[in-house]
Amino acid sequence: MNYRPLGRTGLKVSALSFGASSLGGVFRPVDEAESIRTVHAALDLGINFIDVSPYYGATRAETVLGRALRGIRRERYYLATKVGQYGEGEFDFSAARVTRSVDESCARLGVDYLDLVQCHDIEFADLDQIVGETLPALARLRAAGRIGHLGITGLPLRIFPAVLDRVEAGCIATVLSFNHYELNDSSLADLLPYFGRLGVGVINSAPTGMGLLTERGVPAWHPAPPAVVAGCRRAVEFCRARGVDIVQLAIQFAVANPAIATTLVGTANPAHLERNVAYAEAPADPGLLEEVLEVLRPIRNHNFTRGRPENRDPILA
């Protein structure tokens, strides 16, 4: 496993990290014992960064993860969770709620401090509140030793400079972006030099586009435009015809960029996790990668957006 610095946090994180949303049964019904085995397998394979949220499975993911981590030395892993989103359409970024949220997460996870706490999907928030209320409340917890570092997460890329440009240097240590550094959409790359100048660590999530780049395909709720779904399906079939699982290429593409500290993958299946780690540790076939990127060129960087109107990215026609 390769390890990279997470911005200026002083943390060296595995290039592939564990997204614990699957432990909450977000994508399919999961067995708790299997979920716990998956967490243990991740640590044994060298993954040292775990990301979760109280939103995933209505706190179930944090609860199961806490059980999995029971008895494991705290120095073996870095633990990140989130505040602000607690149910479908249920957001509360007030100082009182996020302060209480940190205490609740620590209790569920069985820890007395968190390495990273992130404001969850801030495109649904008033960014004035994030800057003026939420982050100062979390900074007080950081000063008290409950939190190591602060981060922000979301889908629209515009939200990151919209907040980072308004806070003191060092206030925000990380950004978590998803669906914007994958085979069909690498628009996050445009912001990487900016994050680098600020010393902000970049966490990439959803390298398969939340199912777009998989044999199984997208779930019914997936918001991608039909043209994007169809274009990704062509890439899946192209890889299949060449005897390659497109997930392999997607993971290899995501972890190859040294400006991205870590890429999150989520699964509650130990065998799938072992497969993903093996993919990440092997280089991509450059010829195949070039061919697949060409297949995807007509939909390149075409994606969906969401959030408050003022926080949304423009959509390519």
Predicted regions and their residues:
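Beta/alpha (TIM)-barrel catalytic core signal, keyed to glycine-rich beta->alpha loops juxtaposed to Asp/Glu
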Residues: 122-299, 303, 311-317
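Acidic (Asp/Glu)-rich catalytic clusters
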Residues: 8, 44, 66-76, 106-111, ...
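Short, well-ordered coil/turn segments that N-cap beta-strands
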Residues: 11-16, 46-48, 73-77, 111-115, ...
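Conserved, mostly hydrophobic/aromatic
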Residues: 6, 18, 35, 50, ...
